[in-house]
């Protein structure tokens, strides 16, 4: 399995072109600059449309809009928002620990 990891795109995700082939893309946070809903929706629309089989993301310290979100409604089955939770993709477990996690939520 090939995994592509990106982070800290700060609203510049549209500038990412010709990214390497992979089975899974993981965005490790800071996809927004100010953490607004508009920035977050722009990122999600871009991320969902990427041509990777599986997509995983967590929040960073800039992604304020999703800090208190337990989940996001209506994501496609191949897009995983890991806010202090895990998922398994083709036998490999992914765990997302958000930037602002309370210590008692660490397994």
Give the positions of each predicted feature:
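Core catalytic region of metal-dependent phosphoesterases/phosphodiesterases
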Residues: 6-89
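Beta-strand-turn-beta hairpins that frame and shape the catalytic cleft
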Residues: 1-4, 86-96
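Binuclear metal-dependent hydrolase catalytic cores centered on His/Asp/Glu-rich metal-binding motifs
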Residues: 92-107
């Amino acid at each position: 399995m090939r995994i592509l990891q990106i982070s800290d795109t700060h609203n510049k995700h549209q500038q990412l072109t010709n990214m390497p082939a992979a089975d899974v893309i993981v965005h490790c946070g800071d996809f927004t600059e100010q953490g607004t809903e508009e920035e977050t929706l722009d990122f999600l629309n871009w991320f969902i449309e990427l041509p990777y089989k599986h997509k995983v993301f967590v929040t960073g310290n800039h992604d304020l809009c999703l800090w208190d979100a337990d989940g996001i409604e209506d994501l496609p089955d191949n897009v995983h928002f890991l806010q202090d939770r895990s998922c398994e993709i083709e036998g490999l477990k992914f765990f997302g620990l958000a930037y602002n996690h309370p210590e008692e939520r660490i397994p």
